[in-house]
Each structure stands twice: as structure tokens, then as C-alpha cells.
Amino acid sequence: MVMQRTFVMIKPDGVKRGLIGEIISRFEKRGLKIVSLKMVKMSRDIAEKLYDEHKGKSFFEELVNYVTSGPVVCMVIEGDDVVQVIRRMIGNTDPKEAPPGTIRGDYALSKSENVIHASDSIEKAQREMSLFFDKSDL
């Protein structure tokens, strides 16, 4: 196994609904380490950078407005094969496709209010971490 770090963000609906502790607890029970954590109100500029790959898509504006609508909790999480482990733990973007026992399967309300974001590759994780954390935070 290879020790990796990834970026995870609890979205405004997860924060508003009081799911922060439950979500973090799931990661810790899985043996993953929270390296850094902060609650922020994301600027539009950062949101556009975070979701840059979706620029030009029909849902881009709604997504940016949503993630800037309230506080989010940003985390850097470390563990063996952590990118894939967390992707499996959070489940499909569409909660109808996310099995029970996954974070989205248990808590997501819709495709847009789906509680959580997690990087889907090491490269994206590094880019996304750098949007929210300085090297000294890690």
C-alpha cells in the first residue's frame, strides 16, 4: 500500500444539517488520518477554480452558487490508497446510484445537494489542497 493524501470538502448542506462529526467519524473509524481541517466561506473565485473542469457545462453556475452559499469544511486526509478508499466511502454523485452505507447514499438529498466533495485523483488532490491550505498547514 502507498500512503497518500487527498482533499475532501463537506458541502454547505452537510454543514447546515449537522453532519460534520458523523462524516469525520466515518473517516477516522476507517483508519484514515485527518492531517488538516478548516471551515471556510468559499469565494466565487476559489469555487470556479475548484470546479474548473465543469466550466461551460449547464450545471456549472448552480454548482458555484451552491458551494459559496454557506460554510464548507475542507480537509486533507491521509491513508493507504486514500483517494480510492474515500471515493468508495462517499458513493456516486447521484444519491439514487449511491448504495446505503456510503456517505451520499445515507445523507445526500439530490445530485446537487450531495453533502461531500472528494478529489478523484492524486493530481487533482494536490491542486485542490493548494486552493485551501498552505504548505505550513500540512
UniProtKB/Swiss-Prot annotation:
<keyword id="KW-0067">ATP-binding</keyword>
<dbReference type="InterPro" id="IPR023005">
    <property type="entry name" value="Nucleoside_diP_kinase_AS"/>
</dbReference>
<feature type="active site" description="Pros-phosphohistidine intermediate">
    <location>
        <position position="117"/>
    </location>
</feature>
<dbReference type="GO" id="GO:0004550">
    <property type="term" value="F:nucleoside diphosphate kinase activity"/>
</dbReference>
<feature type="binding site">
    <location>
        <position position="59"/>
    </location>
    <ligand>
        <name>ATP</name>
    </ligand>
</feature>
<dbReference type="GO" id="GO:0005737">
    <property type="term" value="C:cytoplasm"/>
</dbReference>
<feature type="binding site">
    <location>
        <position position="114"/>
    </location>
    <ligand>
        <name>ATP</name>
    </ligand>
</feature>
<dbReference type="GO" id="GO:0006228">
    <property type="term" value="P:UTP biosynthetic process"/>
</dbReference>
<comment type="function">
    <text>Major role in the synthesis of nucleoside triphosphates other than ATP. The ATP gamma phosphate is transferred to the NDP beta phosphate via a ping-pong mechanism, using a phosphorylated active-site intermediate.</text>
</comment>
<feature type="binding site">
    <location>
        <position position="93"/>
    </location>
    <ligand>
        <name>ATP</name>
    </ligand>
</feature>
<keyword id="KW-0479">Metal-binding</keyword>
<keyword id="KW-0597">Phosphoprotein</keyword>
<keyword id="KW-0808">Transferase</keyword>
<dbReference type="GO" id="GO:0005524">
    <property type="term" value="F:ATP binding"/>
</dbReference>
<dbReference type="Pfam" id="PF00334">
    <property type="entry name" value="NDK"/>
</dbReference>
<keyword id="KW-0418">Kinase</keyword>
<feature type="binding site">
    <location>
        <position position="104"/>
    </location>
    <ligand>
        <name>ATP</name>
    </ligand>
</feature>
<keyword id="KW-0460">Magnesium</keyword>
<protein>
    <recommendedName>
        <fullName>Nucleoside diphosphate kinase</fullName>
        <ecNumber>2.7.4.6</ecNumber>
    </recommendedName>
</protein>
<feature type="binding site">
    <location>
        <position position="87"/>
    </location>
    <ligand>
        <name>ATP</name>
    </ligand>
</feature>
<feature type="binding site">
    <location>
        <position position="11"/>
    </location>
    <ligand>
        <name>ATP</name>
    </ligand>
</feature>
<dbReference type="GO" id="GO:0046872">
    <property type="term" value="F:metal ion binding"/>
</dbReference>
<dbReference type="InterPro" id="IPR034907">
    <property type="entry name" value="NDK-like_dom"/>
</dbReference>
<dbReference type="InterPro" id="IPR036850">
    <property type="entry name" value="NDK-like_dom_sf"/>
</dbReference>
<dbReference type="GO" id="GO:0006183">
    <property type="term" value="P:GTP biosynthetic process"/>
</dbReference>
<keyword id="KW-0963">Cytoplasm</keyword>
<dbReference type="InterPro" id="IPR001564">
    <property type="entry name" value="Nucleoside_diP_kinase"/>
</dbReference>
<comment type="similarity">
    <text>Belongs to the NDK family.</text>
</comment>
<keyword id="KW-0547">Nucleotide-binding</keyword>
<dbReference type="GO" id="GO:0006241">
    <property type="term" value="P:CTP biosynthetic process"/>
</dbReference>
<keyword id="KW-0546">Nucleotide metabolism</keyword>
